[in-house]
Amino acid sequence: MPQLNPHPWFSIFITSWLILIIILLPKIKSHIPNNSPTNKKNMLTTPMPWTWPWT
């Protein structure tokens, strides 16, 4: 039985995964919420209004 050279299969496998990641990465990033520190800092500095339960 002849021995197969694994090199082209590794390159095909890696290339296909890279193409898949490049295509899917913007779609995945659009679903992840943005965790930039400026937004968190702005949210911490602005006071949140409190609605009192007895009013």
UniProtKB/Swiss-Prot annotation:
Any Pfam family the entry gives: ATP-synt_8
Gene Ontology terms, MF aspect: proton transmembrane transporter activity
Cellular component GO terms held in the UniProt record: mitochondrial membrane; proton-transporting ATP synthase complex
Record flagged with keyword Nuclease: no
Listed InterPro entries: ATP8_metazoa, ATPase_protein_8
Topology versus the membrane: Single-pass membrane protein
GO process terms (BP): proton motive force-driven ATP synthesis
Keywords: ATP synthesis, CF(0), Hydrogen ion transport, Ion transport, Membrane, Mitochondrion, Transmembrane, Transmembrane helix, Transport
Transmembrane segments: 4-24
Main location: mitochondrion
Keyword Cytoplasm set for record: no
Subcellular location: Mitochondrion membrane
Coiled coil segments of this chain: none
Described purpose of this protein according to its UniProt entry: Subunit 8, of the mitochondrial membrane ATP synthase complex (F(1)F(0) ATP synthase or Complex V) that produces ATP from ADP in the presence of a proton gradient across the membrane which is generated by electron transport complexes of the respiratory chain. ATP synthase complex consist of a soluble F(1) head domain - the catalytic core - and a membrane F(1) domain - the membrane proton channel. These two domains are linked by a central stalk rotating inside the F(1) region and a stationary peripheral stalk.
Record-linked PANTHER family: ATP SYNTHASE PROTEIN 8 (PTHR39937:SF1)
Family under the similarity heading: Belongs to the ATPase protein 8 family.
Subunit details: Component of the ATP synthase complex composed at least of ATP5F1A/subunit alpha, ATP5F1B/subunit beta, ATP5MC1/subunit c (homooctomer), MT-ATP6/subunit a, MT-ATP8/subunit 8, ATP5ME/subunit e, ATP5MF/subunit f, ATP5MG/subunit g, ATP5MK/subunit k, ATP5MJ/subunit j, ATP5F1C/subunit gamma, ATP5F1D/subunit delta, ATP5F1E/subunit epsilon, ATP5PF/subunit F6, ATP5PB/subunit b, ATP5PD/subunit d, ATP5PO/subunit OSCP.
Protein name: ATP synthase F(0) complex subunit 8
Origin species: Pelomedusa subrufa
Taxonomic placement: Eukaryota, Metazoa, Chordata, Craniata, Vertebrata
